UniProtKB/Swiss-Prot annotation:
It comes from Gallid herpesvirus 2 (strain Chicken/Md5/ATCC VR-987). This is Uncharacterized gene 82 protein. Residues 1-10 have a biased composition (Polar residues). Residues 1-63, 83-108 are annotated as: Disordered. Residues 33-62 have a biased composition (Basic and acidic residues).
Amino acid sequence: MSGISLTPVKQENEPCSFLRHDSGSTQAVNDTYVDRARPSADAKEHCAASDPEEWHSGDRPPRLCRKPSRFYRRIVIPETAPVLSPRYDLSDEPHAPGTTMISGPRTQ
């Protein structure tokens, strides 16, 4: 990452840019970073292919969105992202026989 500086920018009302949800939570903020060290040749192709709906699936890597004179990397957190994943049980409650505790080390 040497030679690359990422600067947060807030440019609302632009596609591939900054989105803030009504909740105001920092978990629901879509930040845009500008990489000033990269060229931005195919702006139309990348920005036109950016569909906000597909970011909510969580199974794709972040898409790069290039616009004239700037290079954007989108970091998107779904509106409904939980603080902790429901897969992990962090409670101290005893687990029922036959279930697996995956949250921490097992003590004998």
